[in-house]
A protein has these predicted regions:
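Short connector loops at helix/strand junctions that flank enzyme active sites
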Residues: 44, 54-56, 69-73
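Vicinal oxygen chelate
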Residues: 1-19, 25, 33, 40-41, ...
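Short, solvent-exposed beta-strand edge segments and adjacent coil->beta transition regions
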Residues: 14-16, 71-75
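Short beta->alpha connector loops
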Residues: 80-82, 103-104
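Residue-level signal for inorganic ion chemistry
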Residues: 31, 76
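Short, flexible, solvent-exposed loop/turn segments with mixed acidic/basic and small polar residues
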Residues: 63-68
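Short hydrophobic/aromatic beta-strand micro-patches
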Residues: 18-20, 77-81
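Short, conserved charged micro-motifs
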Residues: 26-28, 82-88
Length: 126
């Protein structure tokens, strides 16, 4: 048995990712539509979606007074079966392509309606 020089970590379960937003309900509904997820909490200042009601992690959108002003320090990456079709679908939902200085890459950087960056990846390399 290996002895660690520090206490073993607690058993952690990833509950959710918090997303600051100007309009939690509108942004949460947009992401629910984009991901095909379900709404599990719809309160005035908090709006939570999950892949299924009892499946984690979720996305919890919370109201903040300030607007987003700089590039995200954390963003989500998605790998669809068909990158081109998924980018077209997300654009039709209201996403936008984003140029954050990434240059030509095999992924597409996009933003949601409040300007939060995320990436749509290409096919996984074998």
């Amino acid at each position: 048995m290996i002895s660690l020089p520090y206490p073993a970590p607690m058993s952690l379960e990833w509950e959710q990712v918090m997303v600051d937003s100007a309009d939690p309900e509108a942004l949460g509904r947009w992401w629910a539509e984009a991901l095909g997820w379900v709404v599990v909490n719809d309160e005035p200042d908090e709006f939570e979606i999950r892949p299924a009601p009892d499946r984690l992690p979720g996305l919890l959108f919370t109201s903040v007074p300030e607007r987003k002003t700089v590039k995200n320090r954390l963003h989500l990456d998605f790998r669809p079966d068909d990158q081109e079709a998924e980018v077209a679908r997300l654009l039709a939902l209201g996403a936008r392509r984003a140029d954050i200085g990434q240059g030509e890459q095999p992924w597409v950087t996009m933003t949601d309606p409040e300007g939060n960056e995320f990436c749509v990846l290409g096919a996984r390399r074998s």
